[in-house]
Amino acid sequence: MLRNKSQKELLHLSRQLIQPLLPNFHKGQAGKIVVIGGNEDYTGAPFFASHSAALVGADLSHVICEKAAGPVIKSYSPDLMIHPYLMDLDNPHLNLNNSELEKLKNLPIDEIIKTNDNAVLNKLIDELILPKVTSLLNRIDIVVVGPGFGRDPLMLKSLIRIIEEVKVLNLPIILDADSLYLVSLSPKIIANYPKAIITPNVVEFQRIAKALSIDVDLSESNKDKLIDQTIEVSRKLGDIIVFRKGEHDLIVKSSKFLINEITGSNKRVGGQGDTLTGAIATLVNWSNNYILRLWDNQVDLDQEDANLLACFAASSVVRNASSKAFNKYGRSMQTSNVHEYLHESFTELFGDSIFRTSNI
């Protein structure tokens, strides 16, 4: 249904996915999002992802982060709910002796990604981290993992265990940033999970493709070849959605694909990808609610097309907002400037749609 549609036609079709704000809805029905990531060094990434999800329209936006990052992210915005449940190996509450700590810090990455081969890490996660994380996951609609996660062994092992728990709970999950590093090392972490979306940039895509024995040339610009590569990655990962970021965003699920050619910003700055991930989370959740007829809507799309179209809509909002921010700020544009224009971009593309009750 979506193949060969123009950009304008795809935007028009996207309107039916925009969840209205009806008087009978209660808090949370427009989206309960959680972003899992953030450590002492990287606090901006999870903030931008969760803040974007909220600005695009999610009711409740949570962040699960490492303890040292919690107060910092809280200081950015009182609108987000911050849960400092994650721990790295420098956390004093771990009660590890120096020799144990040094051994864990020097663990080779291949040992970290093995499921059950490190009893010490798994014990720490089972006792101190996973119970709190799982308690929140049970109240969440969609999960984002990876922004600002870092490469600490305990953090990475926690990320693997959290992804496993998300799959057990059958929740939609978007993998970005450091979680894509894990996928490039062990694609089976997310392969064949139908509710997964990965959002690699050019370099991340090449790493994942290499892990799947697919050759990718970073200088490749032929559109058909880019599409074929992305289709092959999606298929080898079990037909999950691959959102390949670039000059034009390429959104693929098995043989289905959409290309977003809407003009974005001429400047690339840290955090824009996190903004996109948050927008994807809100809109994909709405597309799932659309399939469930949450607002007594007519359903003209299947699940795959609805999710692909939601990704296209999110890409459009962020690209349009980035273009507006760049037009105002030029070379000085930062990701926080993009956030200034998310609402304006959304309403420009999709209208207000607050009390809409039809698919028009």
UniProtKB/Swiss-Prot annotation:
Q: Give the residues the record marks as binding (6S)-NADPHX.
A: 148, 201-207, 274
UniProt EC number = 4.2.1.93
UniProt entry keywords in alphabetical sequence: ATP-binding, Cytoplasm, Lyase, NAD, NADP, Nucleotide-binding, Phosphoprotein
- The primary location reported for this protein is cytoplasm
One GO molecular-function entry: ATP-dependent NAD(P)H-hydrate dehydratase activity
Q: Which cofactor does it need?
A: Mg(2+)
Identification of the protein by name: ATP-dependent (S)-NAD(P)H-hydrate dehydratase
